[in-house]
């Protein structure tokens, strides 16, 4: 059966590719964008299967209206893709509070608002898929993009917990964590930055240079990512988190190895904070005994 999608940030970039892939699969799409005129070619090609909607994800009322449009137009909502987002490369010290808040509001609260509007519909249907387009930046960080990383780490934690809450009534939540994607994201993230204070040249300055050098050369193919999302939307089993791209996989492995090494280095302080009543030793022994059983605390 054809599905009904709501996709945020579908005017261009990855969101546009996701919308095109869903429509090519025979599904219907409520396509959210700040400028709906960008969606005119989709309407011309797919007609009534596309419902453009002006959607500023930082506006909770607009998120509710977009979900309502899906239900009113097609009778249900099967797939939500929270794709809208952007980054801003600038030292935290030099970034205005307004710019910081705008990134967090878009990349995190935008996800919260559309998800909050969609969950009641999916709960009543007893099915649905929610895809959060996060980033490898939700597992690791780079200098110069503090609000983006703050938001993406928040999306991961929020979605992990949400997945547990909604699983009993058939709703699947998957956080997608791509590496570099060949879109205009990097160019936009490096625009309108202040002149760096000299002290930040070694950290933020080097990241900006690398970002600009990779423009148009990122490994991630947005059309292939869109195809993966369409495939998962038709599956009864989805991962809670999915890394996308060899570059992302490599960086995550490096970050996890570095964290494990740091944790081991400072373990003497970690274990120094417990009561000395014998419980620590017994819990440690229990953990060792269950390490191969697949059980969880």
PLM feature segments, named:
Residues 11-12:
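Conserved glycine-rich cofactor-binding loop
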Residues 48, 69-82, 88:
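A glycine-rich helix->loop->beta "capping" turn
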Residues 115, 151:
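Active-site helix of classical SDR
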Residues 55-65, 97:
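The beta1-alpha1 cofactor-binding region of Rossmann-like NAD(H)/NADP(H)-dependent oxidoreductases
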Residues 135:
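Residue(s) in the substrate-gating loop at a strand-loop-helix junction
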């Amino acid at each position: 059966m054809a599905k009904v999608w709501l996709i945020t940030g579908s005017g261009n970039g990855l969101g546009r590719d996701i919308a095109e892939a869903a429509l090519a699969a025979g599904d219907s799409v409520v396509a959210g964008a700040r400028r709906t005129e960008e969606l005119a070619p989709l309407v011309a090609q797919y007609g009534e299967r596309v419902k453009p909607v002006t959607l500023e994800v930082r506006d909770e009322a607009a998120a509710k209206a977009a979900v309502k449009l899906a239900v009113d137009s097609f009778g249900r909502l099967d797939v939500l893709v929270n794709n809208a987002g952007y980054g801003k490369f600038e030292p935290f010290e030099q970034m205005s509070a307004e710019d910081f808040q705008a990134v967090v509001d878009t990349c995190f609260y935008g996800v919260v608002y559309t998800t909050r509007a969609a969950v009641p519909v999916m709960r009543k249907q007893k099915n649905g898929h929610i895809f959060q387009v996060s980033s490898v930046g939700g597992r690791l960080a780079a200098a110069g993009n503090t609000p983006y990383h703050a938001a993406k780490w928040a999306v991961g934690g929020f979605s992990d917990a949400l997945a547990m809450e909604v699983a009993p009534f058939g709703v699947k939540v998957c956080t997608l964590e791509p590496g570099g994607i060949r879109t205009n994201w990097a160019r936009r993230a490096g625009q309108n930055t202040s002149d760096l204070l000299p002290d930040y040249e070694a950290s933020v300055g080097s990241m900006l240079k690398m970002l600009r050098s990779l423009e148009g050369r990122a490994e991630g193919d947005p059309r292939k990512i869109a195809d993966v999302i369409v495939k998962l939307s038709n599956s009864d089993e989805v991962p809670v988190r999915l890394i996308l791209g060899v570059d992302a996989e490599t960086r995550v492995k490096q970050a996890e190895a570095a964290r494990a090494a740091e944790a081991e280095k400072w373990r003497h302080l970690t274990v120094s904070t417990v009561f000395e009543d014998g419980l620590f030793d017994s819990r440690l022994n229990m953990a060792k005994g269950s390490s191969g059983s697949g059980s969880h605390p």
